[in-house]
Amino acid sequence: MRMTMEEMKNEAETTSMVSMPLYAVMYPVFNELERVNLSAAQTLRAAFIKAEKENPGLTQDIIMKILEKKSVDVNFTESLLRMAADDVEEYMIERPEPEFQDLNEKARALKQILSKIPDEINDRVRFLQTIKDIASAIKELLDTVNNVFKKYQYQNRRALEHQKKEFVKYSKSFSDTLKTYFKDGKAINVFISANRLIHQTNLILQTFKTVA
């Protein structure tokens, strides 16, 4: 049975999403290791990237096994969200033009606000303010994306438009998750949705970096 284009896109999204722990958890570890042993860190980083590409989700499985063996009781989804605000060099746009650097800044701002959700969610007043800040940050990021579209022409504009639509879709999904949260109080679903939105934010940067 052949998959439809939409199913293929969904599968690709799921595949890349499970690889999130590679850059959110392991990249900072590699960066620290580089200070001690640059060669070993680079070798280990390359090995993890290759293994993750061939077996999406492998990094997450390894981390979970280590936590299990050490009997560490941790909410992995929540922890991932807390760590996901850091810049990922592979996604940062290197072009020096102000519009592209602004895109980096707006993406960073959104990810940082989203990563604070676990600290804010139990304080209703602060969390409501955080939600407003997230909405503003989403709008600012989309405005910046549109500014880049206006100023620069791309051969692969379709890929950029698609990624923008995906980002909007996950932004709306995040909004719907928040509405449900205020009814059922299940914070874990908010964390999952926030992680997905951070992932989409990184994919916007990655797409622009690839075609720019």
Swiss-Prot record:
GO BP terms, alphabetized: angiogenesis; cellular response to leukemia inhibitory factor; establishment of Golgi localization; Golgi reassembly; intrinsic apoptotic signaling pathway in response to hydrogen peroxide; negative regulation of apoptotic process; negative regulation of blood vessel endothelial cell proliferation involved in sprouting angiogenesis; negative regulation of cell migration involved in sprouting angiogenesis
Classification via Gene3D superfamilies: 1.10.12.70, Nucleotidyltransferases domain 2
Main location: cytoplasm
Membrane topology (UniProt): Peripheral membrane protein
Gene Ontology MF terms: protein homodimerization activity; protein kinase binding
Any one GO CC term of the record: cytosol
Pfam families: PDC10_C, PDCD10_N
Keywords linked to the UniProt accession: Angiogenesis, Apoptosis, Cell membrane, Cytoplasm, Golgi apparatus, Membrane
InterPro entries per record: PDC10_dimerisation_sf, PDCD10, PDCD10_N
Compartment annotation: Cytoplasm; Golgi apparatus membrane; Cell membrane
Function: Promotes cell proliferation. Modulates apoptotic pathways. Increases mitogen-activated protein kinase activity. Important for cell migration, and for normal structure and assembly of the Golgi complex. Important for KDR/VEGFR2 signaling. Required for normal cardiovascular development. Required for normal angiogenesis, vasculogenesis and hematopoiesis during embryonic development. Promotes cell proliferation. Modulates apoptotic pathways. Increases mitogen-activated protein kinase activity and STK26 activity.
PANTHER family found in the cross-reference section: PROGRAMMED CELL DEATH PROTEIN 10, TF-1 CELL APOPTOSIS RELATED PROTEIN-15
Similarity remark: Belongs to the PDCD10 family.
Protein name, as recorded: Programmed cell death protein 10
